[in-house]
Structure formats: structure tokens, C-alpha cells
């Protein structure tokens, strides 16, 4: 019996390298007796409803070939049915969530089929809208990175006022361009661009970050993941406020409605094949951090004390 009976493969529709890698994975998996479903992913393509319907949700592994955006889309559909995701950077940009293409061959592939891998669980958030109709028919929404509330006007740049409550206690009214509610995984995405903190993904925490607030007193706040966050629009005369999930449109937020955000029951499960996988090495490489110890790997003399010259 194969290590994985049913495997789904999602590849970037517009990337030739991604399609070629998907075909190769499919061939290798067929050779060991796996059932394989394959489909493109992108702005106009979503294979996950088909995958779930065709398998009844019984998927042993998802191989996602692309960048972080491809992984975020997979997580929103597959986390709820506890599918482990092998995320491989094929044609992606930054790749905070992905492993290098080398894991698709050689000893890494042997480790995959032998079950010699680790699972890294990443916390997710869920959001639901409450209040007067119209309310979305299909709730809740899920995110691996962040939920974002911001206006989306075609005619002009607008600011909004949002009332923020935590565990039923009103905390503040935030006047600005919007609000981010993020996971530790999302702290290196939109949140860090909005001057929020970087948080290690092993922590169970939620970060609330105002986007371009009009008050210097509006600062990012880090909360324990046990809290419930409620955000209500107080001023939106043009009815422009939208809820976004990992950069994808989720739902409009109408007057007198509240967005309730809390930790999702199911985390995203990332399958790790690299033996020396390190979150902080990823930060160093992606954010171009450096230090004397890293430099010492190339030039040991840099750690010697400076010599005094007359």
C-alpha cells in the first residue's frame, strides 16, 4: 500500500515550470500506486472544490506548486479537512511558506514516500458577519495570513472609522485606511508592511494592526489566541467597506454589521521535508538580514578583535 493513497496536485496555471513539475510529480506518484488528481490554481482557477467533491474530502496529501499566494488559497480549503500540504516554491516570489524545488526529487522524494517528514501546524483565523441582513450565505471565512477590513472605492481614497472590541470590551475607535487582524504566519506579510511586529509562527497569538491611522496613539496590539475580536464600522457613507481574506475578497460589510474574528478550529498542516528547516533562516534569506556569525561562515577572521594601531 502506498504511503499516500490519494494525492492532489495544484500548480500555477500561468507558469510553465509549475505545470512541468506537476506532470513529473503525477508520474512518480502513479508509479507507486497513488491516486492523483491535478488542477491549475490562480486568479481564475480554483481546483479545490473539485478535489474535495471528487474525493469526499479524503485526501492524504496536497502538493502545491507555486508561491505563497498558492499556499494561502490551498489552506483556506484544505485545513478544515486536515490535509497536509507540501508547499514547493515553483515560480513564486518570496516563498515564506514554501520549500525549495529540490524537495521534489532525489533523497527528499524518498523521504516523502517513506514517511520521514515533519508536520508544522500553523494557526488560522475564522471570521463571521453578524447583524442585520444582508448577511453572507456561506460563513465562516478562513485565513492563514490575515483578515483585512478596508474601503474599496473606485472614485476616491477614503478613510473609515472602526470600533474595536476584544472579548466584549470596547477598546478603541480606529480612524484610518483600514485594519489588519493577523496570525503569526501573516506577521511577515501585509502586517509587517503596516509596521506591525514579526511573530514566530510557533506562538499562539493574534495581532491587530491599524493601516495608516490618523492618530499616533493607534498602535499594533498583540493578543493571546484565546480572545474574540469584534470590529464594527462606525462611518461608511459610501458603503465601501470590504472584508478580505489573505488578499482575496470575502464579503461586503454593511452598516450595523459586526465582523467577529477568532482562532479557527483546524490549523494548516505544512509537510516539511528539509532536515535543517529553520524559520529564522528563512527570515534572514527573505528579508536580507545579516550578522557577524553569518559572515564568519565565509570569513572567520571577522570575529577576531580589532587590533590597536599606533
From Swiss-Prot:
The active site is at residue 68. It is found in: Cytoplasm. It comes from the Bacteria. Keywords: ATP-binding, Cytoplasm, Kinase, NAD, NADP, Nucleotide-binding, Transferase. One of its GO terms (cellular component) is cytoplasm. It holds the Pfam family NAD_kinase. It catalyses: NAD(+) + ATP = ADP + NADP(+) + H(+). Its EC number is 2.7.1.23. GO terms for molecular function: ATP binding; metal ion binding; NAD binding; NAD+ kinase activity. GO terms for biological process: NAD metabolic process; NADP biosynthetic process. Involved in the regulation of the intracellular balance of NAD and NADP, and is a key enzyme in the biosynthesis of NADP. Catalyzes specifically the phosphorylation on 2'-hydroxyl of the adenosine moiety of NAD to yield NADP. This is NAD kinase 1. It comes from Gloeobacter violaceus (strain ATCC 29082 / PCC 7421). The lineage of its organism: Bacteria, Bacillati, Cyanobacteriota, Cyanophyceae, Gloeobacterales. The gene is nadK1.
Amino acid at each position: 500500500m502506498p504511503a499516500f493513497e490519494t494525492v492532489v496536485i495544484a500548480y500555477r496555471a500561468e507558469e510553465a515550470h509549475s505545470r512541468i513539475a506537476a506532470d513529473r510529480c503525477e508520474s512518480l506518484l502513479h508509479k507507486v500506486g497513488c491516486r492523483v488528481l491535478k488542477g491549475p490554481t490562480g486568479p481564475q482557477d480554483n481546483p479545490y472544490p473539485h478535489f474535495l467533491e471528487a474525493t469526499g474530502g479524503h485526501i492524504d496529501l496536497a502538493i502545491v506548486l507555486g508561491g505563497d499566494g498558492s499556499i494561502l488559497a490551498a489552506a483556506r480549503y484544505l485545513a478544515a479537512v486536515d490535509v497536509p500540504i507540501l508547499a514547493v516554491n515553483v515560480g513564486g516570489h518570496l516563498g515564506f511558506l514554501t520549500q525549495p524545488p529540490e524537495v521534489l526529487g532525489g533523497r527528499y522524494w524518498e523521504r516523502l514516500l517513506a514517511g520521514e517528514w515533519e508536520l508544522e501546524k500553523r494557526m488560522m483565523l475564522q471570521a463571521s458577519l453578524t447583524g442585520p441582513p444582508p448577511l453572507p450565505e456561506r460563513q465562516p471565512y478562513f485565513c492563514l495570513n490575515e483578515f483585512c477590513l478596508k474601503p474599496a472605492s473606485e472614485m476616491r481614497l477614503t478613510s473609515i472609522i472602526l470600533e474595536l472590541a476584544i472579548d466584549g470590551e470596547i477598546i478603541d475607535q480606529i480612524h484610518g485606511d483600514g485594519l489588519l487582524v493577523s496570525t503569526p504566519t501573516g506577521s511577515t506579510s501585509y502586517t509587517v508592511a503596516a509596521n506591525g511586529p514579526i511573530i514566530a509562527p510557533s506562538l499562539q497569538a493574534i495581532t491587530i494592526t491599524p493601516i495608516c491611522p490618523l492618530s499616533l496613539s493607534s498602535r499594533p496590539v498583540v493578543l493571546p489566541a484565546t480572545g474574540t475580536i469584534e470590529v464594527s464600522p462606525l462611518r461608511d457613507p459610501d458603503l465601501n467597506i470590504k472584508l478580505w481574506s489573505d488578499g482575496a475578497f470575502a464579503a461586503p460589510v454593511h452598516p450595523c454589521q459586526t465582523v467577529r474574528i477568532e482562532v479557527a478550529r483546524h490549523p494548516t498542516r505544512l509537510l516539511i521535508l528539509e532536515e535543517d528547516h529553520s524559520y529564522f533562516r528563512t527570515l534572514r534569506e527573505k528579508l536580507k538580514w545579516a550578522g557577524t556569525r553569518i559572515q564568519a561562515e565565509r570569513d572567520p577572521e571577522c570575529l577576531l578583535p580589532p587590533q590597536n594601531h599606533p
